[in-house]
Regions:
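Phosphate-group recognition and catalysis centered on beta-loop-alpha active-site segments
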Residues: 1-239
Length: 239
């Protein structure tokens, strides 16, 4: 298929998801409920967020793992004492429309807490969990079985020591559902390769409309941006 003379590649099957990174941080506070709601009004299909486990085992949403000038770890602060909203509050936004949530975690404990929160909200099927530790993801896939959120490995090409084809094969072998990389890493050839192994291709950090369009033409299964209005503008310029 071609868009304006440019060869485009298909997604794995579902339409591409346009995700607002942190809500609408150019207009509202980053990772705020106001920003998440605004992103939906601006046309985002869901959100890309970062989750942390609080001292009382609640998943809270914030880009940074520490808070304040003393750089206290969010894991040492109860959720009620944190300015970061809980994941449960995000999952309640437009719940009847099932917006996708792609959440980054750093450890298995946080991953398990995300799964509990998603299950409690009836949102397991619209949750993608990203993690840079493939061993954590592989263990979770083995432990949790098929009724779980999608598990996405987040790492650059340079981390694929044996090359992308071997890496995609490994993801399939251990039951990890996809790969996340930033703009500048994905190509149409790479999305086709990962799709050949039935792995999702998650595109991150597209700053401009042009970049979002390129992501879609490459065949990524989701594209994220800090600017949700640009996501909607890019969608409007594509067939």
């Amino acid at each position: 298929m071609q868009h304006d003379g440019v060869m485009s590649h298909p997604t794995l099957g579902e339409p591409v998801r346009y995700l607002a990174d942190g809500g609408a941080p150019e207009r509202e506070a980053d990772h705020s409920l106001a920003g998440f709601r605004l992103a939906r009004r601006l046309g985002a299909d869901g959100w890309e967020v970062t989750g942390h486990r609080s001292a009382d085992d609640v998943v809270v949403l914030a880009r940074n793992p520490t808070v304040g000038w003393r750089r206290r770890s969010r894991s040492a602060i109860p959720a009620a004492d944190s300015e970061a909203p809980p994941l449960a509050d995000l999952l309640a936004i437009d719940a009847d429309q099932a917006p996708l949530v792609s959440i980054a975690v750093a450890a298995r404990e946080t991953l398990d807490a995300v799964i509990l929160a998603a299950a409690g909200a009836g949102a397991t099927g619209r949750m993608w969990i990203r993690c840079g530790d493939l061993e954590v993801l592989a263990a979770a896939a083995a432990d949790l079985g098929p009724t779980r959120p999608m598990l996405i490995h987040e790492a650059p090409l340079a981390a694929m020591a044996k090359g992308p084809e071997r890496h995609a094969s490994q993801l399939r072998a251990v039951g990890v559902d996809g790969q996340a990389m930033a703009f500048g890493q994905w190509t149409g050839g790479l999305t086709a390769l990962f799709h050949r192994f039935d792995r999702l291709c998650v595109g991150r950090s597209a700053t401009h409309v042009r970049m979002i369009k390129e992501f879609v033409e490459m065949g990524v299964d989701s594209a994220s941006s800090l600017n949700p209005e640009r996501l909607d503008e890019a969608r409007g310029k594509l067939p």
